[in-house]
Amino acid sequence: MNLILQVVVAVGIFLIAVALGNTLDYWNRKLYARMQSRFGPLLVMYAGFRKVLGPSRILQPLYDVAKLWGKRTIIPGSSRKNLFKVSPVVALLAVSVAILMTPVCDLTILGGLSWALIGLSYLIMTVSLFWIIGGAASSSPWGAIGARREAELFLGCEIPLITSLFSAAILARSLSFCDILNFQRGFLPIILLNPFAAFAMFFAVLGKLHLKPFDIPDAEVEIVAGPFTEYSGKLLSVIYFTRMLLFYLLSTVFVDAFLSGGLFFKGILYPLNILVFLGLCFLFVFLLSTVHAAMPRYRIDQAFKFYLKYIWPVAFAGLTLSVILVSTGVV
């Protein structure tokens, strides 16, 4: 019975991830368009489509996934076919398991494991690694260039991402996500104790999500879609779905690691935590979208130098601050 309950909770968490990932992705698109004063397709939509899709475009990310799923999948003849086909699937599996390690208002399956943060870090890395492998296996020059850019960006943003998460773990004296939440609930949000780690994490997320100024791997005007250029049909649908879930995952990880997971109320007011959690996720995406709309694209060498010169030192300063706070008994 316990196993059945865990399966039900896991399915529930995944459905929450799909719903919230879709909404956050839509929110990012909407904000980005508004900041650039662009109009959406609703103004020129056929009347027959409006009856099916409704007046809102909030499900547009899922529409994109569903549309691509119905398209024909073309595998390049000169590609490493097995690697090319399996890479998007492994990336999707990695982000799906990572979602189960990330609490949503105390709701989690694997977040209480003593090594949850280590597993989460490896799974987040796995997504980028298999995108690199897929692009390199495509035999396309655009895919190869995109894979190389993805690899360089991976080296730049992965260190501050992991360092920031471990800065939070040091303060909580645990690698369990549930313990990190409980620490913040009984003390202060970690963003107040260690703003350096939160700052570094924010810029690392920009790179992981390929948002400006770090959208170099799949810059459309330069290399079409980068490592995803040769993907089509169901495989491209899987990639879109993975990116949507990654939007949810990284937003949730930031809120959990630095903003108490939105758990500020107890007792009869506990349901308000759900609204706080959602509000913090939307606020985080708003900040991401603002930077995305305001910044031009860096060259890959500029992006790597930016991370190496500014974000890495801030991330290591956050790690040092966490060690000092713990060793001096402040926390």
Language-model segments: residues:
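Alpha-helical transmembrane segments of multi-pass membrane proteins predominantly involved
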Residues: 1-331
